[in-house]
C-alpha cells in the first residue's frame, strides 16, 4: 500500500473519531512450536479448539466493525490458516470492504490458497521469517527453515 493512501486512511479515521484498524485473532493454535513465541497451543489441541469462537461470531464482528467505520483488518492467530473457516472469514472481510492483511508462518500456504489470494488479494501477507540460518531455525522451531520450504508463484 502506498504511504500517501495509508496517510489518507489514517487521517480520515482520525477526523471521524473511528478505529482505523481492527485485528481478528482467530485462534491460539499453531502448527509450529517456536521457542521464542508466546503461542504454545498445538494445532491439534482440543481445549484450544473448543475455546475458539464460532464463524458466526467473527462474521458478526466483521459486520459491526465495518458499520462502525473501521477501515483495515489484520487476520492473525496463532496460525489463522489452521481454521477450516479461514477463507469464509477472510472473504467476509474483503466483501465488507476492509483493507485486509494476514499474519502467518507461511508453512500452510498451498496452491489453492495462493489462487484464492490472487482472486481476492490482501493488502499484505506478513510471513514470519524468524531465522535464516538453518541450524538456528531448527533449534528454535524444531522444523525446517521456511526458506527451504518456499515456493515461487508467478
Give, region by region, the residue ranges found by the protein language model.
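Glycine-rich S-adenosyl-L-methionine
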Residues: 140-154
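An acidic, carboxylate-rich microenvironment
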Residues: 57, 88, 136, 145-148
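A short acidic, helix-capping loop that chelates divalent metal ions and anchors anionic groups
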Residues: 43-48, 133-140
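Short gly/pro/ser/thr-enriched loop/turn and capping motifs at secondary-structure boundaries
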Residues: 107-109, 132-135
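Short, structured coil/loop segments at alpha-helix boundaries
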Residues: 1-3, 133, 143
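Conserved phosphate-donor/acceptor-positioning beta-strand/loop module used by diverse small-molecule
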Residues: 127-129
